[in-house]
Structure formats: C-alpha cells, structure tokens
C-alpha cells in the first residue's frame, strides 16, 4: 500500500514512520521535505497554496494532518479549509485508487460541555473560531467525497502531548502553574498513540466509522494533572487559584495550557480550545485499538524519562 501524508510535521512524521515499519510505501508532503527521515519519501508542498506535487499513481490511503501557521482565524482558514480543499482537488483529479482518506481534526469542534461526557454522537457546538473552521473542514470533506468511492474518516484528537511538548511540565518547573479554582476537565492523547490510531484506522480490514474521538482513557481535571507532575518532579504543589487570588496572567496561562497543544487560546481572544468536557474513546477502542499510554500518568512519566523524540 502507498500512503500519502499530506502534512508531515511531528505527528505526520511519526505516523509515516509507523506506516513504513509496517511495510508500506510512504510519501510525505511538507514545505521542508529535507527534514523527513529516510523511510518517508519527501516532496515539497504548501497545502494552502494549491501548488501540489503529483500523487503517486498507486496511492490507496491519504492522511491529511494540517497545522495552522499561527493561532489566528486567517491562518486556520488557510490551513484547514483551503489546505484540505487543495488536497481533495489533487486526490480527486489524480486517478489514483484511493480508498480511504483520514482527516486529523480536533475535539475543539465540541466547544464547552460543562464537564459532561461527549462522544461521536454529540452534536458539535464549537465555541471559538478554531473549532468552527475545523468543523467547516470536516463538512467539506464529507461533501466532496460523497459518491466518490473514497471513505472519509475524521479523527478528532484531544490535546496532543509527547516528546518536546512540555508546556505543563515547564509551567510546573518554572512555578507559573496555577490549579484552577473551578473543576475543569481536559482531554489529551500522547503523540505516539495519535500516530498509532491514524495507522490503525487507515489499515484495519473493516470499513471505519465516519468519526472517531482520539483521546486517552481518562479525562482529567487540570489540577489533578498539575499535582501529579509536581509530585513526579519532586516539587512543591502549585498554588490553587481563588476568586481574588490569581492574576490574569496566571488564569490565562492555565487556560491556554488546557487546550489542544499549540492552537487557539487567549492570544487570539477566543476561548480555550479545550473547553470543559469529558471525551469518550469507547468507539476507537471497540475497533481493537490499544493505547500505549492509557492515561496522562504513563505518558508524562515516559516524557520525563526521555522516551522518544519530537520530529522536526
């Protein structure tokens, strides 16, 4: 099988390496393909520009793993809507026997659920522009692939953490972490599990569902995660926020840390992409997928032990 990774940053590269290890040919599109490991055939591509290289004639699976250049509405639209549209144009015009196309999305499409449980049946109600634009991209994917014979799969990831993604660890070490006064759930997935889920959904024998939530087994309150990290690091527990006690900077810092890594957040004036919800991964697990890092505890212990590298 030949797999096209349209967008090959840290997550896409890790997924590509896993496809290659399973014996598949992998083509990676990115602006700087010289940074890709030898197992991935690189090609220069700017997804948002529409100037894309030829798709290998034997491509049967496509993974679209896009990241916005900056946390602005324009950047999100250029990446997720324009970029996806350009990839779809290339795929549909290629004549390649593509049978499955997976779009890496985000749980930001759900917005804030007041701490309630959500799953794939929950109606998306994004609270900020990032979630709205990503949801627009999901709808574009479904509309464009309808009747083409290509199965669209949307993988809505929670906050990605892993090697080199150490924002919360750095906050605890630096003393800027603050435990929120209000109970607020966060949902995350280790980079390696996210990559493994991509490979699993693209290669499993039976037809996948239209949407899966890519989160670990345990939604966790932010305070619980911060206390755990402090304990693992042998540091004093972070202070708790009070109605009058925390500065605005402290509040903003914790809100940003709870969202999807690297996106949205207070810098843009929109609510944190993470929201307050508990995401269920039951549907993903029902396919036979198994997590290497079923909760934040195993994942952060691996990071603190220096396991893995972040791909450039």
Over which residues does each language-model region extend?
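A conserved pocket-lining segment of Rossmann-fold NAD(P)-dependent short-chain dehydrogenase/reductase
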Residues: 170-191
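Glycine/proline-rich active-site loop of Rossmann-fold NAD(P)-dependent oxidoreductases
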Residues: 135, 148, 160-173, 200-212
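NAD(P)-cofactor binding segment of oxidoreductase domains
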Residues: 59-102
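Catalytic helix-loop patch of NAD(P)-dependent Rossmann-fold dehydrogenases
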Residues: 114-154, 179
């Amino acid at each position: 099988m030949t797999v096209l990774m349209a967008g090959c940053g840290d997550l896409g590269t890790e997924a590509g390496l896993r496809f290659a290890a399973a014996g598949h040919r992998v083509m990676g599109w990115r602006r700087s393909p010289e940074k890709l490991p030898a197992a991935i055939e690189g090609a220069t591509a700017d997804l948002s520009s529409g100037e894309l290289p030829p798709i290998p004639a034997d491509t049967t699976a496509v993974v679209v793993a896009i990241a916005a250049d900056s946390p602005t509405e324009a950047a999100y639209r250029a990446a997720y809507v324009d970029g996806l549209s350009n990839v779809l144009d290339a795929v549909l015009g290629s004549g390649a026997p593509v049978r499955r196309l997976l779009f890496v999305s985000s749980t930001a499409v759900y917005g804030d659920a007041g701490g309630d449980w959500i799953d794939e049946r929950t109606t998306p109600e994004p609270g900020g522009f990032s979630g709205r634009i990503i949801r627009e991209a999901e709808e574009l994917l479904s509309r464009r692939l309808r009747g083409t014979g290509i199965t669209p799969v949307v993988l809505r990831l929670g906050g990605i953490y892993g090697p080199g993604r150490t924002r919360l660890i750095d906050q605890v070490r630096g003393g800027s972490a603050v435990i929120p006064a209000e109970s607020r759930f966060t949902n995350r997935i280790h980079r390696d599990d996210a990559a493994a889920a991509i490979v699993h959904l693209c290669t499993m024998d039976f037809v996948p569902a239209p949407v899966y939530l890519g989160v670990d087994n345990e939604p966790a309150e932010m305070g619980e995660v911060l206390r755990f990290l402090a304990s693992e690091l042998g540091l004093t527990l972070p202070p708790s926020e009070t109605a009058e006690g925390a500065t605005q900077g402290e509040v903003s810092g914790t809100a940003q840390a709870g969202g999807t890594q690297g996106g949205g957040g207070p810098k843009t004036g929109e609510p944190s992409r993470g929201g307050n919800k508990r995401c269920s991964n039951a549907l993903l697990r029902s396919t036979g997928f198994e997590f290497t890092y079923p909760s934040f505890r195993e994942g952060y212990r691996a990071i603190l032990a220096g396991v893995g590298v972040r791909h450039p």
